[in-house]
Amino acid sequence: MAAPRGRAAPWTTALLLLLTSQILSPGSCADEEEVPEEWVLLHVVQGQIGAGNYSYLRLNHEGKIVLRMRSLKGDADLYVSASSLHPSFDDYELQSATCGPDAVSIPAHFRRPVGIGVYGHPSHLESEFEMKVYYDGTVEQHPFGEAAYPADGADAGQKHARAPEDASQEEESVLWTILISVLKLVLEILF
């Protein structure tokens, strides 16, 4: 049933009020993106890239890094690799290829330097992008309750001292391995 002329349908009025409130709300600015307070902004990179071309960047920062990129003009896509300094859409470990904002979280265990490729999508002659590089200082919890990052600030590669029980179990394991090897040898000789 159509609404009488001169009077808008109730849902149209509600929709207009909702859109107006979204536009006028202070936190709706597209330029301001919310980030957790544990993140530290390291760099802001702006650039231009032609259609079908790559622009390459190198990341040397250690730790968990978050890349947030938005296309100011056109459509730029993001490719990341720990094994190649020139990642592409054929050779990458992480990627974000959306028509909107792109984001990639680079784990702390990725070997540095990390290669970053920004690809200009061929649907636009030229793309402009802005990439924000954040250090993610959040501490992830280990599934068994231990922190993923050492709490005392020790080097992540530092090994913890072994308990005496671990040493005796390791010795016992070596002895069993030797015993089984000798038994296999004896069985091969006999049969």
Curated annotation (Swiss-Prot):
Q: Where is the signal peptide?
A: 1-30
- Subcellular location as annotated: Secreted
Glycoprotein as a keyword? Answer: yes
Chief location of this protein within or outside the cell: secreted
What keywords does the record list, in alphabetical order? Apoptosis, Glycoprotein, Secreted, Signal
GO CC annotations, alphabetized: extracellular region
A Gene Ontology biological process annotation? apoptotic process
Q: What does this protein do?
A: May be involved in induction of apoptosis in CD4(+) T-cells, but not CD8(+) T-cells or hepatocytes.
Family according to the record? Belongs to the UPF0669 family.
Q: What is this protein called?
A: UPF0669 protein C6orf120 homolog
Task: Please tell me the species this chain comes from.
Answer: Macaca fascicularis (Crab-eating macaque)
